């Protein structure tokens, strides 16, 4: 049984745990998982489905309400997935699979931030903003593995 006191882990530890957990989830559904030693293109691993379909996966761990991916690190299509994992103390992580194509039509949950105003220095990003009531209607779950 894993330690479920996630708040005791730092940002790097929770991210590393999330990546391993995601790989185990994919493997448990019969996917082959391929990991690169260097994460310089925004892909944490590649998963090959039992039907032979290859998916590029970016894992994002969150303890609060917002997480983002730099726009230059992901392609907006169905072959690129975000494995969004929400960590709350006392429970196993909630796992959601989100096709990157959702950002082709941004909304209140799947946001686009370009930071083009004077003085803004952040690079453009795609965000996932899940607050309050939105959480219960968040429709992407691990059923997408099947």
Where would I find each of the regions flagged by the language model?
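Mixed-charge (Asp/Glu-Lys/Arg
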Residues: 1-41, 46-146
């Amino acid at each position: 049984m894993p330690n479920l006191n996630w708040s005791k882990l730092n940002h790097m530890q929770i991210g590393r745990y999330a990546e391993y957990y995601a790989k185990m989830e994919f493997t448990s559904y019969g996917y082959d998982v391929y990991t690169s030693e260097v994460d310089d293109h925004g892909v944490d691993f590649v998963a090959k489905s039992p039907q032979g379909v290859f998916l590029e996966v970016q894992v994002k761990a969150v303890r609060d309400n917002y997480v983002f991916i730099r726009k230059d690190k992901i392609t907006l299509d169905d072959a690129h997935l975000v494995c969004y994992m929400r960590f709350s103390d006392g429970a196993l992580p909630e796992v959601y699979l989100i096709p990157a194509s959702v950002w082709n039509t941004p909304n209140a949950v799947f946001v686009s931030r370009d930071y083009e105003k004077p003085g803004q220095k952040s690079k453009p990003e795609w965000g996932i903003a899940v607050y309050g009531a939105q959480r219960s209607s968040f429709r992407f779950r691990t059923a997408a593995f099947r």
